[in-house]
Amino acid sequence: MVGKIIPASNWLRIKRLFKDVKISTQGSRMAAGHDIYAVEEGSIPAKGQAFVGTGIAIGLPKGICGRLAARSGMTSKNGIAVGGGVVNADYTGEVKVILGNHGKGEYQFKACDRIAQLIVEKI
């Protein structure tokens, strides 16, 4: 449901901004981060970058931040890196991910592909 706030952990709340957006998930109970998904398909040219929407907003309490980190498989297999990824507790807009393509060819992604992980940290 659009706009419904979903508790993802003790500190993290997630709000779906658009219909059919995939909400972040944890791969296991012991996973350090929550997988973050692309809201639409796109591509990144070789040696280029893209600002990719996720269709979610997050809520964090004071003293907590979210750090967007690369997914190891995307980096090792495709040369895709996540840039500048801190989400402050007072940010209320859509979470977007800067993806850089360090590979030799164009990188294509689809809606609902995992593009990063969000790690919730005390500051």
Positions of PLM-derived features:
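DUTPase catalytic domain/fold
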Residues: 1-123
